[in-house]
Amino acid sequence: MNRISVAVLSCLLCLGVTHAWAQSPAPASLSVADEKGWTAYLGFQGSSNTFGQVMDLDSNLGYNFGPHFSLDGGVPIYFVRGTNALGNSVSNNGLGDMYANLRLKFRNPTVNYFTTLTGYAPTGDTASGLSTGRAMWDWNNRFDRSFGRLTPFVEVGIGDTVPITRFYNRPYTTLGYNSQLKGGVQYALWRYLSVGAAGYAVEPWGQQKVFSKLNKRNELVGGADLARDNGFNTWMAVSPSQFVDLELGYDRSVHYSLNTVTFGLGVNVGRLFHQQHAGQ
């Protein structure tokens, strides 16, 4: 790493934070069908590296208006374990920011397009690093096309916070404009099992603020390098039934020379309810 990268990482570690790429605000998008009706999804996911673990329990409720348009929202409950700047073990639990997603989906034989606009309400505790204390937003766009079992994809996003996505749960919250780029492939090994790999880059600009989830009442303010990152991740996803999703992943932050293991468990409560109701 260059001197700037080392300095930024040192500052982050002094706040007790680590960098991570990963969880989507609405994991329900992975398993919710396109049919019209209510959706409900319960997800538990987390990330672990040498500095600690960040996990969250996310309950998501939404409504599909048809094959193209849907709304959903929820609020995560965080469980944070790690080591602070003094070397002491710390834990921090609590509600995060409530979020709402507006989704548009356009499936086409040439290329599929999915766009999600996410808004965050400052319901989390700022002193605990679970919120910035301000409303935030993020806009993500995904393009993919399947060639048999192989599905290449590209994601492009912009917002005023580095979003949490599926494969990385970071122990801090950011406030500041940034763009995100991710590209990779997913391969279906068989009906219930798939693997994937992707490279990513987060490119911020302007003033950035970082709120630690490990050291209370700690806020770091700096330039674009504070939130910049790039690297790659790999994952394996298993769906043993149409109601359950399991994921295991690995992330390598090249910018910070940091390795992280991630996991996810999701239950499609809405689909389970609809099937039981239809069977009556």
Q: Where are these predicted regions, by residue range?
A:
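Outer-membrane beta-barrel biogenesis signature
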Residues: 19-51, 103, 144, 272-280
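Detector for outer-membrane/organellar transmembrane beta-barrel domains
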Residues: 37, 132-216
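Outer-membrane beta-barrel translocator domains and adjoining extracellular loop/strand segments
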Residues: 52-58, 82-89, 125-133, 163-172, ...
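Outer-envelope beta-barrel architecture signal
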Residues: 32-40, 67-69, 109-113, 148-154, ...
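Residues that define the transmembrane beta-barrel architecture of outer-membrane proteins
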Residues: 53-57, 92-98, 131-137, 173-181, ...
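Outer membrane beta-barrel transmembrane domains
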Residues: 82-83, 180, 184-280
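Transmembrane beta-strands of outer-membrane beta-barrel pores
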Residues: 44-50, 75-81, 106, 119-125, ...
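Membrane-embedded beta-strand positions of outer-membrane beta-barrel proteins
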Residues: 40-44, 73, 102, 115-117, ...
